[in-house]
């Protein structure tokens, strides 16, 4: 019995060794086939990596979008606010002018940037209350949007106000359609009141905020033209110094 088991084990071992030799001979005799299989495996791996990478690129997160409006701003004084190609800010009786169309871009809670659609310039107010235009979005381009009575809206500087009283400085037009100094415009006067006339809803990229110290400034605090910024004080024209009417 024991001898039969032993001979059976020896036979099984011999058969196993023969199978191993046979497999080794096959591998040696057909190296090109093995190489081909290896190449196929490599291609499969690379294709999977490439496919994974392409899927990853397609899944890029979209840039943040802000929902604003393209609108006209009708002053209670009887003019449409307009921003002319030379940077002049004033009022126009003609409603059809493309210079009277603005992008109102939300940049905070009840805070907007006012940008001319035609010129791509931002409205801004400096530390002396003067309105000017800028190619770049800075803290001086931020205006607080407040709803007044009868659906009129006021726009006041977010960073400048009267030092002692704390009274806000407002965007305003006088009876002649001239832009006024912000510290001469009062909230309860028609000069400060604008009625938005929305044309359509639009999606905007969030403007890149530039620091004011990046730009050269004159002694009066009025932005001046430089290589990095175009700041124009009402297109070089005079502004109304009278109190709001």
Swiss-Prot record:
GO terms for molecular function: beta-tubulin binding; growth factor activity; microtubule binding; sodium channel regulator activity; transmembrane transporter binding. Residues 1-62 are annotated as: Mediates targeting to the nucleus. It comes from the Eukaryota. Residues 215-245 have a biased composition (Polar residues). Residues 1-37, 213-245 are annotated as: Disordered. GO terms for cellular component: axon; cytoplasm; dendrite; filopodium; growth cone; microtubule; neuron projection; nucleus. It is found in: Cell projection, Filopodium; Cell projection, Growth cone; Cell projection, Dendrite; Cell membrane, Sarcolemma. Its main location: other. GO terms for biological process: establishment of neuroblast polarity; head development; inhibitory synapse assembly; microtubule polymerization; negative regulation of collateral sprouting; negative regulation of microtubule depolymerization; neurogenesis; neuron differentiation. Transmembrane segments: none annotated. InterPro entries: Fibroblast_GF_fam (IPR002209), IL1/FGF (IPR008996). Belongs to the heparin-binding growth factors family. This is Fibroblast growth factor 13. It comes from Xenopus laevis (African clawed frog). The lineage of its organism: Eukaryota, Metazoa, Chordata, Craniata, Vertebrata.
């Amino acid at each position: 019995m024991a001898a039969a088991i032993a001979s059976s084990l020896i036979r099984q071992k011999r058969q196993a060794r023969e199978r191993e030799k046979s497999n080794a001979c096959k591998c040696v005799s057909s190296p090109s086939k093995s190489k081909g299989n290896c190449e196929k495996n490599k291609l499969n791996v690379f294709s999977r990596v490439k496919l994974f990478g392409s899927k990853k690129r397609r899944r890029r997160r979209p840039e943040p979008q802000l929902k604003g409006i393209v609108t006209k701003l009708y002053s209670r004084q009887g003019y449409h606010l307009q921003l002319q190609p030379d940077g002049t800010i004033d009022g126009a009786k003609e409603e059809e002018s493309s210079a009277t169309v603005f992008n109102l871009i939300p940049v905070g809670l009840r805070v907007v940037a006012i940008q001319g659609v035609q010129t791509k310039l931002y409205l801004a107010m400096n530390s002396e209350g003067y309105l000017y235009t800028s190619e770049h979005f800075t803290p001086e381009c931020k205006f607080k949007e407040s709803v007044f009575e009868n659906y009129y809206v006021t726009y006041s500087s977010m960073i400048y106000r009267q030092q002692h009283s704390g009274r806000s400085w407002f965007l305003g037009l006088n009876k002649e359609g001239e832009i006024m100094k912000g510290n001469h415009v009062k909230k309860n006067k028609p000069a400060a009141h604008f009625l938005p006339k929305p044309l359509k809803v639009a999606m905007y990229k969030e403007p890149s905020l530039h620091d004011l110290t990046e730009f050269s400034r004159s002694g009066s605090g009025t932005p001046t033209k430089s290589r990095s910024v175009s700041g124009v004080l009402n297109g070089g024209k005079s502004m109304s110094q009278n109190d709001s009417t």
